Amino acid sequence: MDEDGLPIVGSGIDLTKVPAIQQRRVVAYLNQFIVHTVRFLNRFSTVCEEKLASISLRIQQIETTLSILEAKLSSIPGLEDVRVEGVGQLPATEVNGPVTVVVPSQPETPIAVAVPLPPPEASPNIPDPRAAEAAGDGRMTVAKDPRYARYLKMVQVGVPVMAIKNKMVQEGLDPNLLDTPDAPVPDAVKKNTLDQDDDSDDGSESSFSD
């Protein structure tokens, strides 16, 4: 004991004479602790499930949006060889710290994408009433003429009609005859053909006479 009458070591209480805690209170305290802990864990798991469900829904929405975007991009021809320059990984200032993104102040340059245009459709062939007359008379039609037949084949393949007509004008042919392949060849054309045949015959005869 010290000067004030307090024990120097320990509480000075004889623990052998202290009555024990009631067993019912111990059980009640233990039950209350277990119930409180279980409620906390249940609430924590419920909140986690809600967060995970929300994140999963957002991920599904993003995947759906990306699928739609990929489908739209794949439907545009000519984008397979497009490359965007200047896009790379930006360095981070710290390994495990916040990432600092440096945005350049240069204006964005538009990317020109060359999209091939579909070939123009050939104008429908309008039947010409002269076709029946030409077939009945046995005259030469545009489709049977070898000079016009190759241009008609170009139209069927899908070559632009304007380019074909320009080529025909350069060669001295009538480009309007492409619209009427069953029409008879004009008399002037047939006359030129006959003149060329006569010239070739005269040339062959002169060669034989020589």
Curated annotation (Swiss-Prot):
Q: Which family does it belong to?
A: Belongs to the CCDC53 family.
Keyword Oxidoreductase set for record: no
Where in the sequence does UniProt note compositional bias of the Acidic residues kind?
A: 195-204
Q: Where are the transmembrane segments?
A: none
- Give yes or no: UniProt keyword Coiled coil: yes
List the protein's name.
WASH complex subunit 3
Q: Which domain of life is it from?
A: Eukaryota
Q: How does it assemble?
A: Component of the WASH complex.
Cellular compartments per GO CC: WASH complex
Give the GO terms filed under biological process for this record. actin filament polymerization; exocytosis
Question: Which terms are listed as keywords in the entry?
Answer: Coiled coil
- Originating organism: Salmo salar
Q: Where is this region: Disordered?
A: 173-210
Q: Which residues form a coiled coil?
A: 49-73
